[in-house]
Amino acid sequence: MDSYSAPESTPSASSRPEDYFIGATPLQKRLESVRKQSSFILTPPRRKIPQCSQLQEDVDPQKVAFLLHKQWTLYSLTPLYKFSYSNLKEYSRLLNAFIVAEKQKGLAVEVGEDFNIKVIFSTLLGMKGTQRDPEAFLVQIVSKSQLPSENREGKVLWTGWFCCVFGDSLLETVSEDFTCLPLFLANGAESNTAIIGTWFQKTFDCYFSPLAINAFNLSWMAAMWTACKMDHYVATTEFLWSVPCSPQSLDISFAIHPEDAKALWDSVHKTPGEVTQEEVDLFMDCLYSHFHRHFKIHLSATRLVRVSTSVASAHTDGKIKILCHKYLIGVLAYLTELAIFQIE
């Protein structure tokens, strides 16, 4: 599997997304009020096993293919105020002008030496769990071709997409003035992500926050993705644990043939169509026991930081790579759940 590497840092400290995505908004105050009126939501003890994609017929196969096999950085996003799908062309123009202005100020915006770029907003029709979910949309920064041929496509410099899959718990808390797309995924330079995030925050009174994935949720991902029925496996099932030690940390990698991982899951799985917390714990305990039997190492004393399967791979620092279009909606549904939980 491809290893996850930290993005290169930029000289300017202000180029980091966390330096831009700060400050409370009126919507946050509204959500805080909702939190006080509702009980604390515990992690569900069971979840549905992801089924084959329920993408609608109007989904663009080329756009779906474009989203796969790329490493995305995850963010949660509060609802967008007064966002309109009918204004996507105008948003493209305004964001394009904003990026050029920021580049002229000397800020770290990685669009090349010239300003010959184009920002494109487009919908991702069918990329949702229910009819109630808002349509997902894609934002791209593309370098304009210097050639006269209009058919020549420019190089994609940065991509981000916004989605909501089975987001009922958040949709029920906000008014019609807000568009709820709690999950944001970005691919490209962090400096570009920061600039674009700043524009969205100023324009739609929203708030971005990096979405990390803790070891508990990685275990759920490992179980749910291992449970998925595959026509053929495209990747080894792999786990990566981090061992805190001085002077530097130590990583332990454990690779399993995907069919063996599925057989192990089937041996602990008792609830048809669902994954329970007990089954997740048993699945991971079996892996720990197997590893200890062969290598005399107690993995329970380490921290799970990455899970890789034929469905997707995820890292604790909020990086994900989706590999299988059949289970795209299932993967996004769980990520949406995590994003909503972070917002609430």
Swiss-Prot record:
It holds the Pfam family CENP-L. Keywords: Centromere, Chromosome, Nucleus, Phosphoprotein. GO terms for biological process: chromosome segregation. Its main location: nucleus. The modification Phosphothreonine is found at residue 43. One of its GO terms (cellular component) is inner kinetochore. The modification Phosphoserine is found at residues 39, 53. Belongs to the CENP-L/IML3 family. Component of the CENPA-CAD complex, composed of CENPI, CENPK, CENPL, CENPO, CENPP, CENPQ, CENPR and CENPS. The CENPA-CAD complex interacts with the CENPA-NAC complex, at least composed of CENPA, CENPC, CENPH, CENPM, CENPN, CENPT and CENPU. Component of the CENPA-CAD (nucleosome distal) complex, a complex recruited to centromeres which is involved in assembly of kinetochore proteins, mitotic progression and chromosome segregation. May be involved in incorporation of newly synthesized CENPA into centromeres via its interaction with the CENPA-NAC complex. This is Centromere protein L. It comes from Homo sapiens. The gene is CENPL.
